C-alpha cells in the first residue's frame, strides 16, 4: 500500500481490520446442506446466488425490517453486519442460532494515512509513537 500511496504524497500505516464477518442468525439449527432447502434468508449478492443453488430462497429486506421479519417467521435467517450491531438489533432474541464465518464477505484492512511531507517533518520519537500505535491497533483487532 505504501508504494501505491507514495504517488499521492501519502504514507499508509496498517491500523487494524474489520474482523471476521459472521454467517448469520437462524431460527432453526443448520445441521446439513439439506437444511438450506426452502430456507428463506435475508442475503444478497454472490452469497445469495450460491445459497440458492443449495435450495435457499434469498430475500432482499431492508435492515430495519429484519427483526420483525425474523420474529414473524417471514424469513428463517438473516445475515447483517456482525455481533455488536446484530445484538443491538436483538436478532439473538428471535433467531438463536448464529453461525460463522461468513465466507462471502472477507474482512477489510484499515489504514491511517499521513501526508508524507508532514511525516518527514516529525521528530523521530513522534514517528515511533505513531508507528507503535498503528501496530497495536493491527494486533488488537486481529482476532
List where the protein language model places each region.
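N-terminal secretory/targeting leader peptides
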Residues: 1-143
Amino acid at each position: 500500500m505504501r508504494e501505491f500511496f507514495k504517488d499521492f504524497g501519502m504514507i499508509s500505516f496498517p491500523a487494524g481490520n474489520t474482523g471476521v464477518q459472521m454467517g448469520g442468525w437462524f431460527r432453526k439449527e443448520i445441521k446439513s446442506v439439506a437444511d438450506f432447502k426452502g430456507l428463506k434468508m435475508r442475503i444478497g449478492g454472490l452469497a445469495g446466488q450460491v445459497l440458492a443453488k443449495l435450495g435457499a430462497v434469498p430475500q432482499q429486506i431492508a435492515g430495519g425490517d429484519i427483526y420483525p421479519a425474523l420474529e414473524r417467521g417471514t424469513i428463517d435467517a438473516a445475515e447483517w453486519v456482525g455481533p455488536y450491531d446484530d445484538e443491538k438489533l436483538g436478532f439473538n432474541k428471535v433467531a438463536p442460532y448464529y453461525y460463522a464465518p461468513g465466507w462471502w464477505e472477507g474482512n477489510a484492512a484499515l489504514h491511517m494515512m499521513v501526508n508524507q511531507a508532514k511525516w518527514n517533518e516529525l521528530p523521530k520519537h513522534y514517528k515511533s509513537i505513531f508507528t507503535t500505535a498503528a501496530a497495536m491497533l493491527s494486533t488488537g483487532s486481529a482476532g
